[in-house]
Regions:
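Active-site-adjacent loop and "lid" segments of alpha/beta metabolic enzymes
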Residues: 1-21, 32-127
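Conserved Motif II region of HX4D acyltransferases
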Residues: 28
Length: 127
């Protein structure tokens, strides 16, 4: 995780020097990482908060969910919701999702149990 933190800090510094301030951090779940590395990042996601930038989590239907469960991407909605909830616990700001209704329900329950309002609007941009 320290390598990832260092990588992002260097990139943010470079972007800020170029006058680019609006940056979102995406740890890249599923890209050039083992399943174990993906879960380590998810467990330690809050470490990225030190970068002072919004954190995007895109774990919906990823192999890190369906491979350990020995199923298919289409059959991991409950696992996706669990991973999204954990990401919210670990201070994710943005969830990239496939199943909008399930994500909205998870976010709503998270907000109710934590007495917080994550966003006044939830953007729904289906592909």
């Amino acid at each position: 995780m320290s390598d990832m933190l260092h990588f992002f800090q260097e990139r943010l510094d470079s972007l800020h020097r170029q006058g680019i301030a609006d940056v979102v951090i995406d740890p890249g779940f599923g890209f050039a990482k083992t399943i174990q590395q993906n879960y380590a990042i998810l467990r330690q996601l809050d470490v990225l908060r030190t970068l002072n930038a919004p954190i995007l989590v895109g774990v919906s239907r990823k192999s890190m969910l369906y491979k350990p469960l020995q199923t298919t991407p289409a059959d991991v909605l409950p696992a996706t919701v669990a991973a999204h909830t954990l990401a919210l616990e670990r201070v994710a700001d943005i969830l990239r999702v496939h199943d909008v209704k399930a994500a909205v329900q998870a976010i709503t329950i998270y907000q109710l149990t934590h007495d917080v309002q994550l966003s006044d609007t939830i953007q729904k941009q289906p592909r």
